[in-house]
Each structure stands twice: as C-alpha cells, then as structure tokens.
C-alpha cells in the first residue's frame, strides 16, 4: 500500500509515521532524510540538490521528484511505502503520480491530519527537542520530567527557531497557501482520508489503522 501522510506543521505526522512504521511492514520515507542521504552518498541528484540547499534556495520540483522516485524504486518499497513531506504542492503531486504510473503504481491513500489553527500554534510554540537524541517534547502537553533535560538520554532540550512566535504563524500561512490545494487534488481522486488530529495520538492512530485495514 502506497500512503501519503499530510497535515500542517504540528499536526503530529512524525508520531503517526512512527506508529504506522511499527504496525505495517512498509518503509517510512521522509523527504528530509532522503535529501540528506542523497547528499551524503554523493549521488548525481544529491550533488544537484546540494547546490540549491547550500545557497538557501528551494530544490526544484524535478530534482525532488527524481530523488523520491529513485527511493521508491528500491526493493523495500515493493509492498508499499509511507511518504512524509512530499508532495507539498499540486505540481509535485502530479509529478509523483506520473512517476508512480511509470512504475505501475499509484497512491492508495492520502491521510490528512486536521488540527485547528490555535491548537497548532500552542503545539508548535511549546515544542522542544533533545539536542542529542532528537526526542520531541511539548511544554504544554508532554513536558520532560526535569526542566531542560531529556528523559531518555539526559541531553539538553532546545527550541527550533522555526517553532517560535511569528515564525509559527508564517509557517502555517505558507502551508495553507501551498499545501491545502492538495486536499482537493486527492479528494478528486477518491483517496483522501481526513482525520481529526486534536485528539490523543493513540486515538488518531486507531482510526488510521482501522481505515488501512479496511482497504
């Protein structure tokens, strides 16, 4: 099964991706991870992407799509994949569909985790993570046992620059402008599954699991 995981920043995509990966035998493909892998491996596509990334520019769609396509052709994706962080625009979605069609595949389900804007702001502005092991906490909903210290490894807890104040609001605005149209795109294909993400992660996952097992 080929799954797209969608939702605004702070919706809990990372948590659901980990739960899905543990339950279903398909790889979790994060575009951030495969960009880093391509760059570290020194592949031709990775070198092209690095030129843009190092100068602070967005990587063009054709390079991003090619890197994603290269990843989903690997053997561990034969039974499906969970794609997180791509596509972000309808142009990217169309390019992905074309790449999948060339491989005799298609998107089976696009999961959209929907969360009210005010709750997203609270989640993001309270989000901190461990500098060492990258475990994520939330000062409002899931604080560490000891202030400033990771429960898992004792590392220092820090807040990302893009999880602060006005930056959070801007990130959500960009998401709404660029990514919201994707919902209409996948709805037209009959593969969109909207889920209320303001509940606990266990409840959200239970609904996603029920949907996947019904397909």
Swiss-Prot record:
Cite the GO molecular-function annotations of the record. adenylate kinase activity; ATP binding; zinc ion binding
Q: EC number(s) in its UniProt entry?
A: 2.7.4.3
Primary enzyme class:
transferase
Q: Where does AMP bind?
A: 31, 36, 57-59, 85-88, 92, 160, 171
One family name in Pfam for this protein: ADK
The record's catalysed reaction(s) read: AMP + ATP = 2 ADP
The record describes its quaternary structure and partners as: Monomer.
Give the family from UniProt.
Belongs to the adenylate kinase family.
The free-text domain remark for this protein reads: Consists of three domains, a large central CORE domain and two small peripheral domains, NMPbind and LID, which undergo movements during catalysis. The LID domain closes over the site of phosphoryl transfer upon ATP binding. Assembling and dissambling the active center during each catalytic cycle provides an effective means to prevent ATP hydrolysis. Some bacteria have evolved a zinc-coordinating structure that stabilizes the LID domain.
Q: What is this protein called?
A: Adenylate kinase
Source species: Syntrophomonas wolfei subsp. wolfei (strain DSM 2245B / Goettingen)
